[in-house]
Structures are given as structure tokens and as C-alpha cells.
Amino acid sequence: MVKKIETQVRTGIHLYDAYINDSDLIGWHYRTGKVVNLTDYMVGEGKAVTLPTLDLKDFIGISFTTGPDGKLYQLPDQQFANLYWYRKDWFDRPDLQKKFKDIYGYKLNVPVNWSAYEDIAQFFTVHVKELDGHKVYGHMDYGKKDPSLGWRFSDAWFSMAGAGDTGLPNGKPVDDWGIRVEGCTPVGASVERGGDMNGAAAAYSVNKFIDWLNKYAPPEAKEMDFGMAGSLPAQGHIAQQIFWYTAFTAAMTKPHLAVTNADGTPKWRMAPSPKGAYWKSGVKLGYQDVGAWTLVKGTPADNMKAAWLYAQFTVSKTVSLKKTLVGLTPIRESDINSKAMTQAAPKLGGLVEFYRSPARKRWTPTGTNIPDYPSMAPIWWKNIGAAIRGEVPVQSALNTMAQQADAILANLEQKGMSKCTPKLNAKMPLSFWYNKGTAPFTKLANEKPKGETQDYENSLKY
């Protein structure tokens, strides 16, 4: 699908009247000048086919589909976040509570930081080992060198560790990919150019990923991709997962699963993710995917109007609540706060509570700093995949990735873009950037502070 919209934008060949496309491409959509600015379309050419009841203020993801110019380029159709997932029934067991406290000195509960997540992973894999006659693991992930490995990292893993700067929906001047912007102009990904793609927090995040995958996850996880790994926690032998997409909620709440009670309620719960050692208040804390209606210039006018009408129908208040209850990918505040969602909440494992909490606002998609998502996405899985397989050291892989990102920025600078064309910074000594008080930051002396946990209710209070 990305190739289709990319082809239509780059060549002008009309393939489809509309797309549902990830808002991760917002920076590219804005800069190409080929995607319809919906703000102007709704009061101009599309005014007669724009619903008076559309109520854009009711959409929770509008800031994610808005360009640096304040104009709307995509209309959200579905959203899901990546959160922390854990077996609440196991965490609540008095025998496991006591054993954990005896070993680690604090309560087995929702982890506040990565140190606690690591302790809990070790606890279940190394110390508990078996529950009810079955081998159990304290961590689940996937490590196959495959395109889906890319979004495992580009979907805010660096910012969860603490890379980048403060700011919502994305850090400024350095975002969760480690790309620095000045104004709206991307100027570098490598630390030598003021970026953070190969900085200390990025290296820490990849090293932790590899360490946990090798030590605490099922052995087969290393050869799994996103699709293969997604269903594994439902089999009942995983204690927690730090990076779990809420899009799996519907599949994980089916009756007769090992992780579902007889009354249909889940044995598990989702909660806001723990934060890495480099994280500081004000930095985003996770990723939220937004699939959004996108119109491309050059589409025949009548086709575009028909497509816009249909797009609005699919997200209208008449439809969206039912769609949310079935797909569990909410887009409207009114749906989230509805009586129907309150009634559904006990069987959804914390989904409703998360989306009603202030914590939700710290989970955001890839932002406008990324000028060409289709070209830049592959560098993630190819380089980090090589590090996971031990083919190159982590720092070397990240250095190469940052250099490749800089090369893409340089190429875009040479070609030019419709708006906010990249302009690569000169390489400077690291001390120059460290003294600015923004990302990149120096390596911490201690990357494993004491583990800290909290009650579920407190985790929602960001």
C-alpha cells in the first residue's frame, strides 16, 4: 500500500481515489506538496461534500495528522498504541509476590522503569521457570531480520529509552527517530550533525532489546517476525511484554484462551510502558499508530469528492462507536467516554482506562521531522537486524544507520522538496552538541538504576 501511494505521489499516475495510510508519513505528505490539504479542501472544493457533523475536535489524533503549517493532511480512521502487557493473575499471586520481594527487595507490580522490567523478566524466566506444570518466560519479543523488525524500533523504542527531546506529539528539536530539525527543516540524524540516531540512548535501547531477547524470551522468538510473535502471549506462558500493540486486544480476549477467564474477562492487563534510563519528564513515552484517510492531488475531482464522502461516513458518529467496539481502535473522544465503552471495559484488559487517562497523550506516532518515511524506513531493520544477529556491534550498526539517514537527507536537499526541504548540518565535535542542553546527551554512568514498580492505578496518572 505504501508503494502504491508512493508511486501515485511521485509519478502523478492515478491509482486510487483515497488511501488509509499511516500518519507516520505526515512529514513526507506535507513536504511533497502532492497530498490534499484537508483544512482548505473542506472550505473550498470539498465544502459541499463535507459533513457539518464531522466534528474534528472530537478526534483524539488530529495533532498527529497536522503539518507544520497547522493544516490537516489526513483524517484519522483507526488508532492503536503499543503498551506494557502483563499477566495480572500471576502478579497478584501471594507466593510470587513474596518470592519476588525476597529476591529484589521491592513489590512485584507494574514496572515504572526498564530496570524493574528487566528484574521481572529475570524473575519469571530464571527463578520461577514453571507455573502449573508449564515453562514460563518473563519477556516476549521478536528478532527476525525482516521489515517488521524496523517498526519494532522506529515505533518510538528510542524515545521509550529516553532518546530525543521533550515535546508532544514529538520532541523538538530532536524527535524519537533521532532526527534534528531547525524550524521545520531536517538537518541531521547522526550525533555529529546534532541528531541522536546513533547516540547513547539509542545504543542503550538496542543493547537492552538484544539482552532481553537472548536471556528472557522463548528461544524461538529470535526467528519470529511481528505476525508470528503477536499471538504467542495468548498461549499462556508469557509473564509480560514491554512492547505490545493494543491492536491485539480483540484476539487476546476471545473465550477459551489460556489467558481468558471463564466469564470472558482477561487474566492479563495492559498498562503504560516503563521508561528507560535516559527518559526525562516531557518526552513521549510510546508509539500510537494512526491509520488515516489520505487524498492525493491529481485524483479526478468527482472521484475525490466521492472518496471524501465515503471516508467521512466511515468515521462519522453514526458508525465510529460500533467500529470502535468491534475493532478496538478508537478515534473519537465521544466513543471513548461512551456508556457502551464503560460496559465493555471489564473485558478489554485496561484499553478503555488507558484511552480515558492523561497518559494517552504521551503515546504518539512518528512525526513531521521525517521527510521521506518510505525511503528511510528500510535502514532500521537492515542495520539493527544485523546487530541483533551479531553480525556487527550495536554502535557500528547505529553509526551506519545514522550515516545512511544523513545521506537520504542530503539527497532530498539536492533534489528539493515542496516545503521544508532538508538542509544537512556540517559535522561538529560532539562537545558542541552536548553543550546545547538538548539531544544528543552523553552516556550515563549508570544505565541500570534501582528497579521501581507502582500500582496499576498510579501508572495512568502521567
At which residue positions do the language-model features occur?
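Extracytoplasmic "Venus flytrap"/periplasmic binding protein-like
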Residues: 1-58, 93-95, 99, 239-240, ...
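Short helix-initiation/N-cap motifs at beta->coil->alpha
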Residues: 1-4, 112-116, 220-235
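Beta->alpha turn/N-cap motifs
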Residues: 21-25, 226, 243-249, 272-274, ...
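Hinge/lid segment of periplasmic solute-binding proteins
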Residues: 23-83, 267-273, 445-460
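Extracytoplasmic/periplasmic substrate-recognition and gating elements
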Residues: 66-71, 214-219, 228, 238, ...
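Glycine-centered hinge/linker elements that transmit conformational signals in sensory
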Residues: 116-122, 160-223, 269, 273
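Short amphipathic alpha-helical coupling segments at ligand-binding clamshell hinges
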Residues: 204-208, 301-314, 376, 397-400
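Long, aromatic- and glycine/proline-rich binding clefts that accommodate carbohydrate-like moieties
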Residues: 265-275, 325-388, 418-448, 455-457, ...
